[in-house]
Amino acid sequence: MAEQPIRYEFIKECKQTGARLGKVHTPHGSFETPVFMPVGTLATVKTMSPEELKAMDAGIILSNTYHLWLRPGQDIVKEAGGLHKFMNWDRAILTDSGGFQVFSLSKFRNIEEEGVHFRNHLNGDKLFLSPEKAMEIQNALGSDIMMAFDECPPYPAEYDYMKRSVERTSRWAERCLNAHNRQDEQGLFGIVQGGEYEDLRTQSAKDLISLDFPGYAIGGLSVGEPKDVMNRVLEFTTPLLPKDKPRYLMGVGSPDALIDGAIRGVDMFDCVLPTRIARNGTVFTAEGRLNMKNAKFERDFRPIDEECDCYTCKNYTRAYIRHLIRCNETFGLRLTTYHNLHFLLHLMEQVRQAIREDRLGDFREEFFERYGYNKPNAKSF
């Protein structure tokens, strides 16, 4: 195989927690890890421009294979010169495989060895997605990091079902590698499945490591399981993965889960949470989250977070943002989205600094105490 387009550089381990500080090198630049990746489902991070994402120091964003396959279609993106040119983003892009959307959005699906028959969630048309098709679409999109097409089992799932699912995901992963025809330009990550069963996670990791992917994702978490289950699964799964490859926990983006994931050896995270809740008027602050629709902000002329130096907090007040959100003004959604993404990207910078200083455990305690996670009945984000 030619030299891998995706390379992980280990920098240091936190003596207090074992968390990793590293750097991922891609054809479109490098980024330090642990990293949070904003989600740009349809080749746009909702309400944000690429320039704004760069201003908050996003080194990599995620786009969605399933959605781009349906609209505008991978051929149009390819004709534009690939996803980077299409959306005017010259930093790294990761595309998911479409597997999660097939299993979560489509009410009518039939899984067989060849792939999955399902219905388009927009118009009900019959569609078929296979490992080969997922690779064809992602090769056309031209992302830096592609994901293997996996089966996404429901939570909770019976052991026997999960065992069959893991075996199929391993077979599909091999088919993805064989179908991936731009291996010198795009890195393909395998996805470890197995639910909360340690022996199945072990088998899944073993199968995928034998195929020598340039990176590995941990799938099947953040699907409704309690936080302690997720942490337990990470504790026995991340040590199975190679130390010289990046580890990506899919679909995780609440502040507590980002910190706890980093402590358990995860390098990369993505989630729609910060952008989705922003559009409902909910924002992160160092002292917990706020709902900007709340009447108590009507005459509150402070910034969302007095410690935050983002564009929103430097220029606008809670009262103004509440007014915009209540009037359904697009600018309000832009301001809350900007702040939430900046908050999580800055949080990951704090996590990386704490690893450098061997004090991530202390940082976790300080952050959880201020944010309110230690209170009884604390919300998850």
Curated annotation (Swiss-Prot):
Catalyses:
7-aminomethyl-7-carbaguanine + guanosine(34) in tRNA = 7-aminomethyl-7-carbaguanosine(34) in tRNA + guanine
EC number(s) per UniProt? 2.4.2.29
Give GO terms: molecular function aspect only. metal ion binding; tRNA-guanosine(34) queuine transglycosylase activity
Q: Which UniProt keywords apply?
A: Glycosyltransferase, Metal-binding, Queuosine biosynthesis, Transferase, tRNA processing, Zinc
Question: What does the entry list as the binding residues for substrate?
Answer: D96, S97, G98, G99, F100, D150, Q193, G220
Q: Where is this region: RNA binding?
A: 251-257, 275-279
- Disulphide-bonded residues: none
One Pfam family linked to the record: TGT
Task: Give the top-rank taxon of the lineage listed in the UniProt record for this protein.
Answer: Bacteria
SUPFAM superfamilies from the xrefs? tRNA-guanine transglycosylase
Active site annotated at which positions? D96, D270
Q: Which GO terms describe its cellular component?
A: cytoplasm; cytosol
Question: InterPro entries per the record?
Answer: ArchSynthase1/Queuine_TRR, TGT, TGT-like_sf, tRNA_ribo_trans-like
Q: Which GO terms describe its biological process?
A: queuosine biosynthetic process; tRNA wobble guanine modification; tRNA-guanine transglycosylation
Q: In which pathway does it act?
A: tRNA modification; tRNA-queuosine biosynthesis
> Is DNA repair included in the keywords of this UniProt record?
no
Mind telling me which PANTHER family this protein's record contains?
QUEUINE TRNA-RIBOSYLTRANSFERASE (PTHR46499:SF1)
Purpose of the protein: Catalyzes the base-exchange of a guanine (G) residue with the queuine precursor 7-aminomethyl-7-deazaguanine (PreQ1) at position 34 (anticodon wobble position) in tRNAs with GU(N) anticodons (tRNA-Asp, -Asn, -His and -Tyr). Catalysis occurs through a double-displacement mechanism. The nucleophile active site attacks the C1' of nucleotide 34 to detach the guanine base from the RNA, forming a covalent enzyme-RNA intermediate. The proton acceptor active site deprotonates the incoming PreQ1, allowing a nucleophilic attack on the C1' of the ribose to form the product.
Oligomer status and interactors: Homodimer. Within each dimer, one monomer is responsible for RNA recognition and catalysis, while the other monomer binds to the replacement base PreQ1.
Write out the similarity annotation: Belongs to the queuine tRNA-ribosyltransferase family.
What is the recorded name of this protein? Queuine tRNA-ribosyltransferase
Q: Which organism is this protein's natural source?
A: Bacillus subtilis (strain 168)
